[in-house]
Amino acid sequence: MCPPEQPAKAMAPSKSNQAAKSAVPTKEEKSADLVMATNNSSIVSKRSVEMLYYPEPHFFCHFVKKPQRRAPLINRGYWLRMHAMEESVRRFMRESPDKPKFVLNLGCGFDPLPFILLSADRSLCSQTTFVDIDYEKLMLNKKAALREAGALTQILEDVEFGPDESAVQIRSGQYVAVGCDLKNLDKLDRVLRAEVLPAECAVLFLAEVSLTYMDVKSANAVVSWASRLSNDAQFCILEQYFPDGPSHPFAATMMEHFGKLGAPLHSIHEFPSLSDQERRFTEAGWTHAHARSLWDLWSDDEFVPAVLRTSLDSIESFDEWEEFALFASHYFLLHASTRPGTKGSKSAAATADVGPSRQAVTRSNEFRLIPNTSLPTGQRRFGALVPGGEAVIGIHSGWGRQTRVADTDVYKTSKDNIDSHARFPSSNDISARLCHTITAFSDDGDCLLVGGRTSPASALQDTWVRKNNVWQAGSSLPLARFRHCATRVTLGSDRSSGSVLIYGGKTSDGTTLDTWLLWNDNGEGWSSVTVRTMNDAPAPKARFGACLASIDSTNGLLFGGIGPDGTILEDFWTWKLYEEADGSLCMELTDQTGSLRNIALGFDILPRFGATVSSTAQGLVVSGGIIPRRVVPFDGEILLLDSATLLDCIKNGLPLTTPILSTIGLDAGFTGPRPLLVGHVSHAISTDQVLLLGGGAVCFSFGTFWTRGTWMLCPVGERAVNDWALVCENVEKPTKAKAAAQIPAKTKKQKASKKYKPEKYKSTTKVTPIRRVTVESADEFQQILEDAQPVIIESADIGPCTELWTKEYLVNTVGSDRKVIVHAAETETMSFRTKNFKYESKTFGTFMDEVHAGGRQYLRSISEKQPAKLPANLAADFPSLSSDFRLPEALKTVVENAHSSPLRISGPVTLWLHYDVMANVLCQIQGEKRLILYPPSDVPHLDVPAGASSSNINVFQNRADGAIALIPHTSPHEARLKRGDILFIPPLWLHTAAPTGKVSVAVNVFFRNLSQGYALGRDVYGNRDVQAYEKGRKDLEKLVKSFSGLPPDMARFYLLRLADELQETAEQ
């Protein structure tokens, strides 16, 4: 039974080990602590999986005191990791029990794998002893947890706890815990041979993402030593690898993440591929080694039975398939053995390391992929492409930076004005969605929007039709669906207009569909299509996310998609649509899978999920998506299908006998930033050019990657220029304009005529000093976050910047000629309300001279490259300074969730009182600074206008004598920062700052302390109010307007009553 939840997220250090904290840790100890810290995040994620997917009893709860429910992607990824390790151990234990078995978990962390297996199947474990091995420090903590967990000791039976100085910390009949650094192999070997292992035994080594944190030499030593510990040894290692090189967007994001954590991956560089990993083991004394990606294992019915895969969807709705595949394709499970004659399955090189360039016909030298990444670009994925006319297209809805969006990003090639409101869906009418389709059905650009979803459990049934540039609701689908596929077809003699054929998809309850429907522009709505297959073959399996394309008006092809069992289907069909004599619709399908396999080299990279298909004069261009068993390789990202040959086979009822598949890839000479063609859209902008837009993915827990810019595929011989660029984001936002138009003219005039007169307050010196603390662990800082009170963290290591960043050093390092934008104030107090300052562009050297001479100037750095789009980032904007500044390890949550890190340099000038929605830490580097802070509860008394975040009050109106404004009903707090201090400012605490002497230099790091709820869209400064407040203000406008039909006194009466009710609710 699990203990009650505690405030801490993961285990705190044992008391016996806390004394070690007072000593200054060595470099190796710091490195070990960073590696052990990765275990904390891992077990929290595994606990999330356990809560949802595992039956009672639960075991991670004894090590994770405060559970968190992770996102479905994280849950499924960790479920697969856990299943891979558990299944590997089960297979080992099922082998003939002619000798004792030992499972040695190298770098076990707090993973309770032995307890899970012993509890689930005691008889299977009867001949097995589990041995957990990790750092001494970690195993002391694990021992302390077991002492307190009666449920765990009852499973082990006859548990003995060793003294802290002993290598064997815990011993029972089937479980041993050993504290030993894996780099100390002499000690580990001695302990295992003398105290744990008998002379004859079978040993299975486990290493789940543990050896990769060691330097390569030390990790290789472990692999080699393990092969000699027993004459009957096996090794199962689960780690990251580069299936398509380190430049793949997922790989690059993953590596950057671990680098930021201070726990970089090492072995991956020495052994990047599966074949390299197999060689690593065979050269270290292992007789056989076989590696497979987790994505490959996911599709293996023997390793993950189909019934088990499908059961996961009944527990938690899931639709992050592309992102799951990317994760699973970058992790491998390798099984090695010292037994002679061990048989492995097909080598890794044959299943996952061979790129299509060695298998399929390539035409990469015939095409160019031209990026345009220099101009602003939208960020959305899983939207739908909307044709907008000549040289104009849009991406409608989909997933934006933080949530679903209902508007349209518009792209064009010229600077001509466009009537976006007429051509693109209105966010006022059509709700936000993703995984929907928009299909043109006429030469005039008329199109049909179909279905989609909000969440995977909420499919949409509506349709919308654009005719003559007007969008109107259409006939609802017979059944709501998303991830369906759609294409234009034309039946009858009128070729200028047509119909839309849709197939497959998924419903709200998770049912995968196999139905064909036809929508016709004749007012009749949807018609079902009867399916007939040639040669009495079975009909295609139900699927979603498939590729459906027309070759001409009534013939086309279908392939790929994911079936009901959660794997990508590897079939290929051609189809012919026709009308029977009675007017009914019929679809004739031919299974071309067998013939295509026989003639098409590289067929394994053709089955796709989430790919796009565009028709060109060259053939059908297939781009992106995911494929079975491995990641889509660089030279297989874009494929070309011979549509002429396909059409000839369909019309003549013949099987395929000549190759139709060739690869284009990302261009043989391509050297730019690689796009991630997932969740993207594509469009044939001419007969031989295809434009790729949008896309990106959540790269597991490592961060989000967005494909930047526009990408145009064209033949090599063309003199093409990619000048497609984003016109504007969120083109459909008329709500504010309409609201403004509805304000009476008199009200506008009255508001404009008001003159701001600052109120004079009495003075006071009574302030509450902010507490000073030292923070030595992440747990201590987490407690500070939970307390939500400002503190000054002193004696922290923020790098050599506190000594180095003199005026001369900064000018020389940043560059005297570097252009910066500064606030130049008219007085010593800047006011955001009266704007008594101006923005000036000048060189950094000039600014530093002037500010050190007493100039009333203030620099708050902004993004150097895209100041209107990206938040400030010290490392990116001032790379020459980045190595001088760092946050202490205890504040790693700030680093992991950082939003921005502006550099602040100020002279004798005071910033206005304001609040920030995000939490932040202000690191004082040079000079001293005085800040006055007010708790969020004081905001009604601080003259902060509705919808604004800045106050109109000058708190330092009597700064000369150290007094501040005496504002009734407020509780001012004071922070006096000196060099090296870190001030933690919780969200919504209003604050203002003034230097107390010479020039002040500081770095602010804003970070997200909420998992959701921030404002939608761009937030460069991190101070936009939360989404609920912004929406609430809009709702308030509607509420006030609803009383417009009443006499003013009655409206006021009821509005005040509502205000009282709202205040009562807020104060509960």
Swiss-Prot record:
It is an enzyme of class 2 (transferase). Keywords: Methyltransferase, S-adenosyl-L-methionine, Transferase, tRNA processing. GO terms for molecular function: tRNA methyltransferase activity. It comes from Emericella nidulans (strain FGSC A4 / ATCC 38163 / CBS 112.46 / NRRL 194 / M139) (Aspergillus nidulans). One of its GO terms (biological process) is tRNA methylation. Residues 1-31 are annotated as: Disordered. Belongs to the methyltransferase superfamily. LCMT family. This is tRNA wybutosine-synthesizing protein 4. PANTHER family: TRNA WYBUTOSINE-SYNTHESIZING PROTEIN 4. Gene3D superfamilies: 6.10.140.1470, Cupin, Kelch-type beta propeller, Vaccinia Virus protein VP39.
